């Protein structure tokens, strides 16, 4: 009887560990159903932040925002965890200069489906603005230093 309970408990532990309950995310990262997110308060250029995200988690990249729901999730995550007075937070959107026009892409290689951008300047990188509660994307100089959000598959 004790052996059956022990085996049953062991199978339950294995099942729960394989069920994708958020345990698939790196320690201290936040998750939705499919992705893991982390707000880093290191001040990096866009390129440095993009490289850093690839080193933090398997399949990691600067955050791509694919829906209004994900935009709200990311904005809330930043607002709850903000530890700096920076005006912007880097996201993974950037303009690829391909003659004769620009093509906006995410660092994970995906195309832009959902868009909430205000292009005030002729710049190639994008960030979320503090004044809009991190809900609107602005194009910025890629060489500026800001905190950033990384995203990886769960």
From Swiss-Prot:
Complexes and interactors: Heterodimer with the alpha subunit (AC W5XDM0); disulfide-linked.
Ranges of residues in domain C-type lectin: 32-151
Keyword Signal in annotation: yes
Name of this protein: Snaclec lebecin subunit beta
InterPro entries found in the cross-reference section: C-type_lectin-like (IPR001304), C-type_lectin-like/link_sf (IPR016186), C-type_lectin/snaclec_domain (IPR050111), C-type_lectin_CS (IPR018378), CTDL_fold (IPR016187)
Protein family per UniProt: Belongs to the snaclec family.
Primary location recorded for the protein, binned into one broad class: secreted
Localization per Swiss-Prot or TrEMBL: Secreted
Pfam short name (any one): Lectin_C
Disulphide bond pairs: 25-36, 53-150, 125-142
């Amino acid at each position: 009887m004790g052996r059956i309970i022990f085996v049953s408990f062991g199978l339950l532990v294995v099942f729960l560990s394989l069920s994708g309950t958020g345990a698939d995310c790196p320690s201290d990262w936040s998750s939705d159903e499919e992705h893991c997110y982390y707000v880093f308060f290191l001040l990096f250029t866009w390129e440095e932040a993009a490289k850093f995200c690839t080193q933090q988690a398997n399949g990691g990249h600067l955050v791509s925002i694919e829906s209004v729901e994900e935009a709200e999730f990311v904005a809330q995550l930043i607002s709850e965890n903000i530890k700096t007075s920076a005006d912007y937070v880097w996201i993974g959107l950037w303009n690829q200069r391909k003659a004769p026009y620009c093509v906006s892409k995410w660092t994970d290689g995906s195309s832009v489906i959902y868009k909430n951008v205000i292009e005030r300047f002729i710049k190639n990188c994008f960030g979320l603005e503090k004044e809009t509660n991190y809900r609107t994307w602005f194009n910025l100089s890629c060489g500026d230093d800001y905190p950033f959000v990384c995203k990886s598959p769960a």
